[in-house]
Amino acid sequence: MRRHDKSNKPRSAHVRHILVGHKPEARDLIEQITNAKNPLRMFKKLAKKYSNCPSGSKKGDLGEFVEGQMAVDFETAVWATDIDQKPSKFVKTQFGYHIIWVHSKTEHQ
């Protein structure tokens, strides 16, 4: 019987995002989040109201995903973002402009 090698387990992350179609809209939402007394609460509120992604109904919650499941540029931004860091920039993919909030990350094990 072969042992499962846990050292090859891919990275994973639990994130929320807001997906919008235009750069000025993304900038405006980031400003609202940054200036809020409770940035995460504001993020959730804005995700529900403005996100073009079906996850908007879940306040932007994408749940946990493993490396390789999302668009490359999106994942690159996730791995470069600190946990629970207020978003200060957005990332552009073929789907539009994403504002990302990272709740947790696990590195390769």
Where are these regions (language model features)?
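Proteostasis/folding factors centered on peptidyl-prolyl cis-trans isomerases
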Residues: M1-G21, K49-Y50, D73-Q109
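Conserved active-site and cofactor/substrate-binding residues in soluble primary-metabolism enzymes
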Residues: P24
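A generic "cationic amphipathic patch" detector
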Residues: E31, K59-G60, V91, Q109
